Amino acid sequence: MIKTALVAALAMVGVANAYISTGQCPTPTLKASFDAVKYMGLWYEQARDGGMPWESNDCQQARYSLNTDGTVAVKNSQYDPVADQVDVATATATFDGAKGAVRFFEYAPAGDYEVLDTDYSTFAIVYSCSSYYLAKAEYIWVLTREQFVDDTLMFSALQTIRNKVPNYDQTSIRRTTHGGSCKYLNEVQPY
């Protein structure tokens, strides 16, 4: 019972810090002919919704690898400069085309994971939305294969978000810092 209450409380904290607006979740056009195998590997987070309490630091990475049962192993990391450590969260995801569901905790509901667009070798734009009665909580991530990207790529990503999710408030998007004092996972995984 206590564990269930804790999971529910954490979920509500996440909802309380998302970009919340009225209405139901949209159904944006997702990446056509999504190829999960090409999507696997290391991604650097370049931007995200600024209200995510569990992603409060910089130096963010996401690693995806296929499991033998067809699910996807997810390993997200961020550097915590106060503790001088890399924090890691693991999850399992399932995909049906470009629409996925990610579960970080056994008893927590799976989170929405929609690939709006990707070229697999340079960038990916991910959208998530959960409906709650008359409101919705939305999140956005811009991922890249390279640690550093130019403003042209970011401008293009923001334009794609504007076109595919026109009512999403882009003022909530926060750029992620890389380089400098960043520390990353020191592991190499086959993908």
Which ranges hold each PLM region?
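A beta-rich soluble binding module of mature secreted/lumenal proteins
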Residues: 2-191
